Amino acid sequence: MNLIKMSDIDLSGKRVLIREDLNVPIKDGMITSDQRLQAALPTIKSALDSGAAVIVLSHLGRPEEGKYEKKFSLEPVADYLRENLEYPVRFVKDYLSGVGVNPGELVVCENVRFNPGEKANDEALAKKLASLCDVFVMDAFGTAHRAQASTYGVAQYAPVAVAGPLLIRELEALNQVLKAPKKPIVAIVGGAKVSSKLSLLKQLVGMVDVLIPGGGIANTFLKAQGFEIGISLYEPDLLDEARHILILAKEKGCQIPLPTDVVVGKTFSETCPAFNKSLSNVAADDMILDIGPETIRDYVDLIHDANTIIWNGPVGVFEFPQFAYGTRAIAIAIAESDAFSIAGGGDTLAAVDLYDLNQQISYISTGGGAFLECLEGKTLPAVAILQERAKHVKTN
């Protein structure tokens, strides 16, 4: 990887602008999951320990661009960092005209998406952000697939632009899966829609030995094979695509095991009774909401035989306890495996959190869309600009 790392640069006394992904869930002003903050803390602390004057940028949620909304404010994040760092931390709302910051001090800037032009990678905005620093550090893997002012444009115009430790770790973990994976490789791809993961599914059938579809994706494959799925979520417009992927998988020597038994309900509800059924017994008014015990055993056996595991998406509606057995069993099987395992995506991370398996998965990616695009073989714009800038950087 032709990238200059943050650790290659002397940061002492320099203004260091770090783009992190601090987009955490906040309810009633309280952070409900600090996973992304914990992932970002080592980078921020390292820069402060080096004697840098540190400024942090991030987005939070999806506010209307250019409009302040308190529920999308990064102030609770600044409070969290203040409590978890032994350095002074200030929260600054207006920063585009300049920020006074001292070595050994951290300034947390307000949500970058409150700035008009952020998503469009506005040149004037990017230059204002770049003027805040001597060194720009891109550490937000979760937004590296977006060419925006705070991820791409600022890297174009900053005096020096480098990759942060978290970004490097993410890319190295994915590289281990993409460049020299140990076989057999098993991928679990769940979620509601084939359409959102069509490119990924096509890419994976040429790369992995076993591709286990889950959730609405599995339902679409089942329907494409002529099985009764009742009123289950599926995509009628993508049945031909599903059939094409099954044919492609056969040509490539990739196994796509489909459920042989399922757990159904009559409504999508936390209080809905759950019933185990063989696939041949699914009724016209049934809704498939999880995989059954026989399928769980089959999938767990496949996972135990793997040397590399990729996990993106649940295999059932794990938010409802009666439909969580499949996802829980898959998660535990991955955690217990000796294989190199990488997990990514919001629902996947929520499941890892729920079952307290953070320490047992080889690598947990902080990215959703960026994670998928890497697996699809795409170049991430924010990484590409760092590679371009690396050609001209002096590391002193």
Swiss-Prot record:
UniProt source species: Legionella pneumophila subsp. pneumophila (strain Philadelphia 1 / ATCC 33152 / DSM 7513)
Subunit structure: Monomer.
Protein's UniProt keywords contain ATP-binding: yes
Catalysed reactions, as listed in the record: (2R)-3-phosphoglycerate + ATP = (2R)-3-phospho-glyceroyl phosphate + ADP
Family as reported in the entry's similarity comment: Belongs to the phosphoglycerate kinase family.
Pathway: Carbohydrate degradation; glycolysis; pyruvate from D-glyceraldehyde 3-phosphate: step 2/5
Class of enzymatic activity (EC top level): transferase
Keyword entries, A-Z: ATP-binding, Cytoplasm, Glycolysis, Kinase, Nucleotide-binding, Transferase
Keyword Nucleotide-binding: yes
Binding site for ATP: 197, 319, 345-348
Record's GO cellular component terms: cytosol
Signal sequence residues: none
Gene3D superfamilies reported in the protein's UniProt record: Phosphoglycerate kinase, N-terminal domain
GO biological process: gluconeogenesis; glycolytic process
Name this protein carries in UniProt: Phosphoglycerate kinase
A Pfam short name: PGK
Subcellular location: Cytoplasm
Binding locations of substrate: 21-23, 36, 59-62, 113, 146
Single GO molecular function: phosphoglycerate kinase activity
Alphabetized InterPro entries for the sequence: Phosphoglycerate_kinase, Phosphoglycerate_kinase_CS, Phosphoglycerate_kinase_N, Phosphoglycerate_kinase_sf
Broad class of the protein's primary localization: cytoplasm
Listed EC numbers: 2.7.2.3
